[in-house]
C-alpha cells in the first residue's frame, strides 16, 4: 500500500477547513448540509470523511483552525509603540467587522452550542493565554504593566468583536472612548512613576 504524504494531506485538510468554515459562515450552521460543504471543497461527501471522523469533528476543527487564523490576522495589526495605539483603537474594529464579521458570528454559533461548549472553553482559554503573553511582550514598549494591559486588551477585543457581530456603533464608540482615555492616563501615570 502506498504511504500517504502527510504534508500534502495536512495542506489539503487546511484548505478543506477554510472552505467549509467559509461555507458555514455564509449559510449558517444549521442551514448548511454535507452536500454544500462537499461542493464548497470540490470533493465528494465521502471524501470529507477521509479528513474528519464526523461532521462534528469537521465543525470543531475548522472553527478552531480558522479562528486562530483570524486571531493571527488581528494580532498582526496590534500596536507595538505608544504612538500606534490610537490608530489601532480607531481603525481595527471597523477592519475586523468588515473582514471577519461573518466568521465571528459563526464562531459564537459553534462555541455557544451545547454540543461544542467545551471546545469553546478550551479555545478561549488559549485566547486568554495568547493575549496575556502579548501584554507581557508589550509592557516594556508601552510602559504599562502587563497586569494592567491584559484587561485593557480584553475590553478592546470584546468591544471589537461585539461590533463585528452587531455593528453597534454606540457600544463600540463608548468603550473605545473610555479605552483611549484609560490608555492615555495610564501611560502618563506610569511614565511619571518611572521618572527619577
Language model features with spans:
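N-terminal intrinsically disordered/low-complexity leader segments
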Residues: 1-11, 194-196
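Helix-turn-helix
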Residues: 15, 19, 23-57, 61
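Solvent-exposed, amphipathic alpha-helical segments
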Residues: 15, 19-26, 72-77, 106, ...
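Hydrophobic alpha-helical connector segments
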Residues: 61, 74-101, 146, 150-153, ...
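Short, basic, alpha-helical segments at the C-terminal edge of helix-turn-helix-like DNA-binding modules
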Residues: 64-71
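Amphipathic alpha-helical packing segments from all-alpha helical-bundle domains
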Residues: 71, 99-102, 115-151, 177, ...
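Helix-loop "lid/cap" segments that line or gate small-molecule binding pockets
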Residues: 90-99, 105-115, 186
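Amphipathic C-terminal alpha-helical segment
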Residues: 106-109, 150-173, 184-195
Amino acid at each position: 500500500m502506498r504511504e500517504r504524504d502527510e504534508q500534502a494531506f495536512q495542506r489539503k485538510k487546511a484548505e478543506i477547513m477554510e472552505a467549509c468554515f467559509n461555507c458555514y459562515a455564509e449559510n449558517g450552521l444549521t442551514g448548511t448540509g454535507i452536500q454544500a460543504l462537499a461542493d464548497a471543497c470540490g470533493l465528494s461527501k465521502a471524501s470529507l470523511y477521509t479528513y474528519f471522523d464526523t461532521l462534528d469533528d469537521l465543525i470543531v476543527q475548522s472553527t478552531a483552525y480558522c479562528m486562530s487564523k483570524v486571531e493571527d490576522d488581528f494580532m498582526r495589526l496590534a500596536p507595538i509603540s505608544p504612538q500606534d495605539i490610537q490608530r489601532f483603537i480607531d481603525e481595527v474594529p471597523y477592519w475586523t467587522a468588515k473582514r471577519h464579521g461573518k466568521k465571528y458570528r459563526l464562531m459564537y454559533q459553534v462555541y455557544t452550542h451545547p454540543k461544542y461548549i467545551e471546545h469553546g472553553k478550551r479555545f478561549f482559554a488559549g485566547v486568554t493565554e495568547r493575549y496575556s503573553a502579548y501584554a507581557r511582550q508589550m509592557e516594556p514598549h508601552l510602559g504599562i504593566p502587563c497586569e494592567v494591559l491584559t484587561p485593557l486588551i480584553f475590553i478592546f477585543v470584546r468591544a471589537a468583536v461585539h461590533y463585528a457581530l452587531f455593528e453597534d456603533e454606540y457600544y463600540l464608540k463608548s468603550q473605545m472612548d473610555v479605552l483611549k482615555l484609560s490608555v492615555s492616563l495610564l501611560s502618563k501615570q506610569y511614565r511619571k512613576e518611572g521618572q527619577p
